[in-house]
Curated annotation (Swiss-Prot):
Keywords: Amino-acid transport, Cell membrane, Membrane, Symport, Transmembrane, Transmembrane helix, Transport. Disulfide bonds: none annotated. It comes from Bacillus subtilis (strain 168). It is found in: Cell membrane. One of its GO terms (molecular function) is symporter activity. The keyword Cell membrane applies. Allows enhanced growth with L-aspartate as a sole source nitrogen source. This is Aspartate-proton symporter. The gene is yveA. It comes from the Bacteria. GO terms for biological process: amino acid transport. It is a multi-pass membrane protein. The chain crosses the membrane at residues 13-33, 49-69, 85-105, 130-150, 161-181, 201-221, 232-252, 281-301, 345-365, 366-386, 402-422, 425-445, 460-480, 482-502.
Length: 520
């Protein structure tokens, strides 16, 4: 039996930035620009700016939490500290679903691009894998598992090597496409042919939110970082600002480089005609060398992300077990390697599972985006509640303006959930309500030593209220097969008012005293 150990503090600020930027520049930039263009036209560039601004607000909140409480898997331990085990359990479930499926998305992206050279990997006329294509995905998952199984240092070194190449390619693409830029493309059918609704759709379902995934991995490895009180806030802010700039420029140069005659079919056709956008546009422009470079990067970028997310997810499973609402075996850390091997095995198994029901990149990205934003939404809530029930907590990074940034960031996360539409919200939030009922049915076995079940329920009703509110608004709203009873801007006003009320409800119904586990 492996000896129990502790996580090793071996990650520097540079490692953190590489992890954050690596998590952001995975498969999303290789697919999202054509999706965004098809939903928002030239105004899609503003989707990246607005999405980056929203993530920056949430990132500032995480910076305070991560610096004050540098915990491995912190993103699903903070809600336990502020609101108890029931809230932590619900957030843990949706976060693990999101991250295990993310690993699958990345290997699926690799297979779809490699199929350009080896068509036998993908079923003709679809994005689904053949048997050999699925075997390739499985082999990649095995590789990520082994890289993380042996040690934290092995993971960091592998991430560094991959990162060097994956950052060069987007910059090269930007430089090359500038020389093919056609300004008139920015006014075809108007700058914003679908209005603000198109920008909203691009953010929630076009891949914008999916692209900004660098927050969780940085916070999840907080317990393994050198000088976390300084390095976590710096890494978060740098990653968000730099990625927003690069994504926006990539979107503009892609739109500008599309041959103008191609746009005669309308913006919605761009998503179909450029399913592998940067490879397709390189071929269309006669830049075979660039197409080859993009495909090589399409193998390394998602591959590097899969490696990062395998690492991150194992830490999240570990944190869930530490919360007391998952089997204790998953809270064990190998003494020799500093890795939670049991958690890694579970992450590996779940990542294999998700390759089965969701065979393509587009099939999973919307669900993952909403699941991730639901896990992001807890950050401003926990931070606000901890300012009430943990006033003496040392906060090396004290976020000024929390009274404004906290409510705003929560409202924006609610907007993104709403924009994803009834089709996605119904089953995702519905499953959360089912998990709530399961927790109550098995409450005999849930942790109650520090916080009674009655107090856990009192501190969790706001979350159930939020889920029910979003289900109602999504059902009567106009996004994703809603009934269309309410439309813009009335729907957003109602969501904002309801979310603001729930924010303050959650802030003042946290635990009477924060249940902080000072054993990292």
């Amino acid at each position: 039996m492996s000896k129990q150990g502790n996580f090793q503090k071996s990650m520097s600020l540079f490692d953190l930035i590489l992890i954050g930027m690596g998590a952001i520049f995975g498969s999303a930039w290789l697919f999202a620009v054509s999706n965004v263009a098809s939903k928002a036209g030239p105004s899609g560039a503003f989707s990246w700016i607005l999405g980056g601004a929203i993530i920056l607000l949430i990132g500032l909140v995480y910076a305070e939490l991560g610096a004050a409480l540098p915990r491995t898997g912190g993103i699903i331990r903070y809600p336990v500290y502020s609101h108890g085990h029931l809230v932590g359990y619900l957030i843990s479930f949706v976060t693990i679903v999101a991250y295990t499926s993310l690993i699958s998305i990345e290997v699926t992206a690799v297979r779809q691009y490699v199929a350009y050279w080896f068509p036998g990997l993908t079923i003709k006329g679809s994005d689904s894998p053949t048997i050999s294509g699925w075997i390739l995905q499985f082999a990649l998952l095995c590789l990520f598992f082994l890289l993380n199984y042996w040690s934290v240092k092995t993971f960091a070194k592998a991430n560094f090597i991959i990162s060097i190449f994956k950052y060069i390619v987007p910059i090269t693409i930007i430089i090359v496409l500038i020389f093919h830029f056609q300004p008139e493309n920015l006014s075809v059918q108007g700058f914003a042919p679908f209005g603000f609704t198109g920008i909203q759709a691009a953010i929630s379902t076009g891949g914008v939110m999916f692209a900004y995934l660098g927050l969780h991995p940085i916070v999840s490895v907080a317990g393994e970082v050198q000088n976390p009180k300084r390095n976590i806030p710096i890494a978060l802010i740098i990653c968000i600002i730099v990625s927003t700039i690069i994504y926006t420029v990539l979107q503009v140069t892609f739109i500008g480089a599309i041959p103008t005659e191609t746009l005669k079919h309308g913006w919605p056709a761009i998503g179909r005609e450029f399913s592998l956008p940067f490879k397709d546009i390189a071929v269309m422009l006669g830049l075979g060398w660039l197409a080859t470079l993009v495909i090589l990067d399409a193998i390394l970028s998602p591959g590097g992300n899969g490696n990062i997310f395998m690492n991150t997810t194992s830490r999240l499973v570990y944190a869930w077990a530490r919360n007391g609402t998952l089997f204790g075996i998953f809270s064990k850390v190998n003494k020799d390697t500093g890795t939670p091997r049991a958690s890694l095995w579970l992450s590996f198994a779940l990542s294999i599972f998700w390759t089965l029901p969701f065979p393509s990149w587009n099939a999973l990205v919307n669900v993952c985006s909403v699941a991730l934003i639901l896990s992001y939404a807890i950050a401003p809530i926990s931070s606000a509640a901890l300012r009430v029930n943990a006033k003496d907590l040392n906060r090396p990074f004290y976020l000024k303006g929390m009274s404004i940034i906290g409510p705003l960031s929560f409202i924006f996360t609610a907007f993104i959930v709403y924009w994803s539409g009834w089709k996605t919200v119904s089953w995702l939030l519905g499953s959360q309500l089912v998990m709530f009922l399961i927790y109550l049915c098995f409450s005999k076995y849930t942790p109650k030593e520090d916080v009674s079940l009655a107090q856990q329920l009192k501190s969790a009703w706001w979350l159930i209220g939020f889920y029910i509110m979003m289900l109602i608004f999504s059902y009567i709203g106009s996004f994703g097969h809603g009934l269309g009873i309410i439309s813009n801007p009335v729907d957003l006003i109602l969501v904002a008012i309801g979310s603001l009320a729930i924010y303050y409800w959650a802030k003042y119904t946290g635990l009477p005293k924060a249940a902080i586990d000072y054993d990292k």
